[in-house]
């Protein structure tokens, strides 16, 4: 029984944030995305205005980063990436 590959899509906000990173930082983000692809429930589920959104926290060079995403069994949609400062306010947009 072969499993279908998971499709990963990204929002324009995530793409903008990702583009600004250095290569080493991009590797850390790629590792975090692989963790999310393997187990989408690893992130913390949000409530209220952000219901249905999960946030995975990881570190890049001692800086805590947050990656917001939504998922269903076949896809992972990356919404935003950034530090905690104003992260949730920007995610609501």
Where in this protein do the model-derived segments appear?
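Enriched for short, Lys/Arg-rich terminal
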Residues: 1-7, 16, 26, 41, ...
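Generic preference for hydrophobic/aromatic residues in regular secondary structure cores
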Residues: 7-8, 47
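Hydrophobic/aromatic residues within well-ordered alpha-helical segments
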Residues: 10, 21, 25-28
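A short, surface-exposed loop/turn module that caps and links secondary-structure elements
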Residues: 34-59
């Amino acid at each position: 029984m072969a499993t279908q590959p998971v499709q990963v899509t990204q929002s324009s906000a995530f793409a903008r944030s990702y583009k600004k990173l250095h290569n080493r930082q991009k590797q850390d983000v790629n590792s975090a995305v692989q963790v999310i692809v393997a187990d989408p429930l690893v992130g913390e589920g949000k409530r209220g205005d952000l219901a249905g959104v999960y946030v995975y926290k990881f570190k890049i060079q001692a800086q805590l980063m947050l990656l917001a995403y939504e998922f269903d069994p076949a896809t992972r949609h990356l919404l935003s990436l950034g530090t905690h400062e104003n992260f949730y306010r920007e995610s609501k947009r």
